[in-house]
Amino acid sequence: LKICQITTLGGMKRSLVNMTKKALNKLVKLLALETLEENLFRGQSENIGGPRVFGGQVIGQALTAAARTVPEKRFAHSLHAYFLRPGDMEYPIIYNVERTRDGGSFTTRRVVAIQKGEPIFDMALSFHKKEKGPSHQIDMSNIPGPKECISDMDIKKKIIERIPAKHRDFFLRERPIEMRHLPGESMFDEPTNQLPYKHVWMKAAGKLPDEVLQHQAILAYASDMGLLSTSMLPHKLSYAKGNVMSASLDHAMWFHRPFRADEWMLYSTDSPSASNARGFNRGSVYTEDGILVASAVQEGLMRMLKK
């Protein structure tokens, strides 16, 4: 048995080839959605090895559905969502868009995602036309650039043996988003007593067209990757350790300035509070030259598991 285990793990290490471009193409198709009729869209889910549909996928698809009903040259500036039920990867998701308001400058939409006749997700979005006004931002943290950080895949190769078998497919899957972590800040690292702060560089794994919606939808997808794990850091909780069960409860996001999701962005996250089995997390997204382009906030359930 021991020999078989070593052989299997060794084979897994050899098979961890960077297939992220292929995964990105799958994500782009996943976010495209099928139009059923006016205000009604259908999306598919990809089995990523986890127990349920990835929340970032539903956020990105709901954003796409809403944007399809909005006048040209109006782009999402904020979204606020609740995860109501776990999504089933074996069934399509129906997105029903409610045209709440079409104003002179702003457009408001509500999207309900439905599976098996029940809502699994509810999101309100606001779209705004380009407008002149005052501008300021908080500066980006002074941290190493993406070339000086550790890739997601390199971290996984080192810790395959430590990832619980039931989580391996999920964590070793092909990812459409390239990620580079500061040493000791990956959600795969061994749990230690850490402050609830984290920084990760991320970008789409290939070139994208110039369509604003596609870049926003992909960043919305990526914003749910690892955000909740920030609140686990001070408590020695880790997916790699298998000592926590977690789920996103809600998600809010603001798009401040134009950006490209296929260029490096810094995702700086912090967790001001955790209580009553819920972790509260915030994220700021910067371009490589320090421009603040988006912000995200999420509260998530995190239950400690006894071994």
In which residue ranges do the predicted regions lie?
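Terminal targeting signals and extreme-terminal segments of soluble enzymes
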Residues: 13-307
